[in-house]
Design a protein with these regions (language model features):
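N-terminal periplasmic "start-of-domain" segments of outer-membrane beta-barrel proteins
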Residues: 38-70, 99, 124-132
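N-terminal periplasmic accessory domains that precede
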Residues: 73-76, 98-101, 113, 137-140, ...
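Repeated loop/turn-to-beta-strand initiation elements of outer-membrane beta-barrel proteins
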Residues: 181, 214-218, 266-271, 330-336, ...
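Structural signature of Gram-negative outer-membrane beta-barrels, strongest in the C-terminal barrel
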Residues: 262-264, 274, 389-391, 397, ...
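Short acidic/polar hinge/loop motifs at secondary-structure boundaries
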Residues: 118-154
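Transmembrane beta-barrel strands of outer-membrane/channel proteins
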Residues: 185-189, 220-226, 271-277, 337-343, ...
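Extracytoplasmic beta-strand/coil segments of soluble accessory domains associated
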Residues: 74-121
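Periplasmic-side early beta-strands and strand-to-turn transitions of outer-membrane beta-barrels
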Residues: 178-307
Length: 486
C-alpha cells in the first residue's frame, strides 16, 4: 500500500512537473510571439507620411508597362494632376523642348530627383530673359526600363526640398539590386501615321545579381533611344511669312552601374555611377520669331545660319554622376549619409542674348560650358514616444556649384562675339540648409506632420520655410487631407 502511494505520488509529481514545464514553455512561446510582433512594428517617417498627403502621386513600373514611354518620362508624368509641359507655357518659347511644369510655376521650380538625389544639369544652359531655357530638362537621364516607380509631389508635400521645389518634385526611383541574377532587354519603336512627324525607337538592357550572395551585389543598365526631328514644313506658314518649328529630335545614350555592400545587419554602403549623353536634331527654332526655314530667300538676316543647321546637332549635354551612400539601422533610429559629385558639359552653338534676335544661332562653332556640383547630405530618423507617438527627422545638406561659361556672357551677332564688360565666365555659389520634421500620430485616425527648413545661400541670403500637413480618416471609406507651406 505504501509502495503504491509512493508510485502514485511520484507519477503525479512527474505529471505536475511536465504540466508546469508545458505551461512555462507556453509562456515563453507567447512572450516570444509578442516580442516578434513588436519587432514588426513599422515607424512611418515624416517623409513617408507626406507622400500619403494631399498632392502626392505614385507612378509604378506596371503603369509604365501599360502605357510605354516613347522617349521621355515627362510624357507620362504630365498625366498627373497639376502637371503640364512647358510647350503650353504663357510665352510659348522653346515649345519644342518641353519640360515638366508643376502647378504652373515653371520648370525652374520643379525639382528632378533620381533615387532622392537632385539632378541639375539643365542649370548649365543659359537662362532667357523671359525665364525659359533651351533645354530638354533633367527627366530623361534614366531609361524607362530601369525605373521602379516615380513619385510626384506637389505643393506642401514638396516643402522639405526647398525653393527649387516650390512647384513640386519628381523623384525617379530606379530598380534595386537583387540577390538572384535577373536581366531584361527592351526594344521599343513608335511610328507615327504622319510622315512629317519624327519616329522613335529605344533599346535598353538591365542586369542585376550578387557577386557575394547577401553581401555584395551589382546592377547595370544601359540605354539608347532616338526620336527623329519633325519635318521643317510640318507647321503651316503664317500671314507674316513665319513658320513655327516642329518637335526637335533627340538622341540619348546612358549607362549606369551600382555596387551595394551589405556590411552587416545594421549597415550598407552603395556606390552609384552614371554617364549620359543627350544631343538634339535641330528643326529651326529661334525662340522669339521663327522664320520660314524652308525658304532660302527669307529676309531674316540669320536665316542662312538656320538653313545650314537644319537636321544637325546644335547642342550636346554630357553628364557624369558619382554618389556614395551609407545607410544605418540602429536600435535608436536610422541614419543616411550621402556624398555626390556631378559634372555637366554643355556644348552648343552661341546664341544672341537680348532683344528680338535673342536665342537665334549665330555661328557654326560650338562653345562648351561646364557645371560642377558637389553635395553632402546627412539625415536621421528617430522614433519617439513623448506625449504622442512620433517620428522625428533631422537633416542637413551642403551644396557647392562651380560654373564655367564663356558662351552666355558674350553678345553674339552676325559680325562675331563681343565680350560683355563684366567678367562672369567663372561663377561659384554655395547653399547650406537644415530641416526638422516630425510625424505625430495624434490618434488612430489623425496624422500630423510639422516641418521647418532653413536655407542659407551665398548669393541670395537666408530663408525659412515652415510646413504643415494633416491626414484625417473619416471612417473606412473617406480620408481628408490638407497642407500649407511657405
Amino acid at each position: 500500500m505504501g509502495k503504491n502511494l509512493t508510485r502514485s505520488t511520484l507519477a503525479l509529481a512527474v505529471v505536475g512537473a511536465m504540466s508546469s514545464f508545458a505551461m512555462a514553455n507556453d509562456v515563453v512561446e507567447t512572450t516570444k510571439e509578442k516580442e516578434a510582433t513588436q519587432l514588426q512594428t513599422i515607424v512611418l517617417t515624416a517623409e513617408e507620411q507626406v507622400k500619403q498627403s494631399l498632392g502626392a502621386s505614385i507612378i509604378t513600373d506596371k503603369d509604365l508597362e501599360k502605357l510605354p514611354v516613347v522617349n521621355d518620362i515627362s510624357e507620362y508624368v504630365r498625366r498627373m494632376p497639376g502637371v503640364n509641359l512647358t510647350g503650353n507655357s504663357a510665352t510659348g518659347q522653346r515649345g519644342n523642348n518641353r519640360q515638366i511644369d508643376i502647378r504652373g510655376m515653371g520648370p525652374e521650380n520643379t525639382l528632378i530627383l533620381v533615387d532622392g538625389k537632385p539632378v541639375n544639369s539643365r542649370n548649365s544652359v543659359r537662362y532667357g530673359w523671359r525665364g525659359e531655357r533651351d533645354t530638354r530638362g533633367d527627366s530623361n537621364w534614366v531609361p524607362a526600363d530601369a525605373i521602379e516607380s516615380i513619385e510626384v509631389l506637389r505643393g506642401p508635400a514638396a516643402a522639405r526640398y526647398g525653393s527649387g521645389a516650390m512647384g513640386g518634385v519628381v523623384n525617379i526611383k530606379t530598380k534595386k539590386v537583387t540577390n538572384e541574377v535577373h536581366g531584361s532587354v527592351e526594344v521599343f519603336t513608335n511610328q507615327p501615321e504622319n510622315s512629317k512627324e519624327g519616329s522613335s525607337h529605344r533599346e535598353s538592357f538591365n542586369l542585376s545579381g550578387p557577386i557575394i550572395k547577401e553581401v555584395l551585389s551589382y546592377r547595370l543598365y544601359g540605354n539608347y533611344n532616338k526620336t527623329d526631328a519633325d519635318a521643317a514644313d510640318i507647321n503651316p506658314l503664317t500671314e507674316s511669312g513665319s513658320r513655327a518649328a516642329g518637335r526637335e529630335g533627340v538622341e540619348n545614350k546612358d549607362i549606369s552601374g551600382r555596387l551595394a555592400w551589405q556590411i552587416n545587419d545594421q549597415q550598407s554602403l552603395t556606390l552609384d555611377t552614371s554617364f549620359g549623353r543627350q544631343g538634339n536634331e535641330y528643326t529651326g527654332d529661334i525662340q522669339n520669331s521663327n522664320a520660314d526655314a524652308t525658304n532660302p530667300d527669307s529676309s531674316f538676316s540669320n536665316i542662312a545660319y538656320v538653313n545650314g543647321l537644319l537636321g544637325k546637332e546644335t547642342n550636346t549635354m554630357y553628364r557624369d554622376s558619382y554618389a556614395l551612400t551609407h545607410e544605418g539601422k540602429w536600435a535608436w533610429g536610422d541614419t543616411k549619409l550621402l556624398a555626390q559629385f556631378d559634372k555637366t558639359k554643355n556644348k552648343r552653338i552661341p546664341e544672341s542674348l537680348a532683344g528680338g534676335p535673342e536665342g537665334s544661332p549665330n555661328s557654326f562653332d560650338k562653345k562648351t560650358s561646364v557645371l560642377d556640383t558637389t553635395r553632402f547630405n546627412a539625415e536621421t530618423n528617430v522614433p519617439l514616444d513623448i506625449f504622442l507617438p512620433q517620428a522625428l527627422t533631422l537633416g542637413a545638406e551642403w551644396v557647392e556649384d562651380k560654373f564655367s561659361d564663356a558662351t552666355s556672357t558674350v553678345q553674339a551677332d552676325a559680325s562675331g562675339l563681343v565680350q560683355l564688360p563684366s567678367d562672369r565666365t567663372h561663377m561659384k555659389s554655395r547653399i547650406a540648409f537644415a530641416y526638422i520634421e516630425d510625424n505625430f500620430k495624434v490618434t488612430d485616425a489623425t496624422d500630423l506632420v510639422l516641418g521647418v527648413r532653413f536655407d542659407d545661400h551665398s548669393k541670395s541670403g537666408s530663408n525659412w520655410s515652415p510646413s504643415l500637413n494633416i491626414t484625417q480618416k473619416l471612417g473606412d471609406y473617406f480620408t481628408l487631407k490638407g497642407g500649407i507651406a511657405r
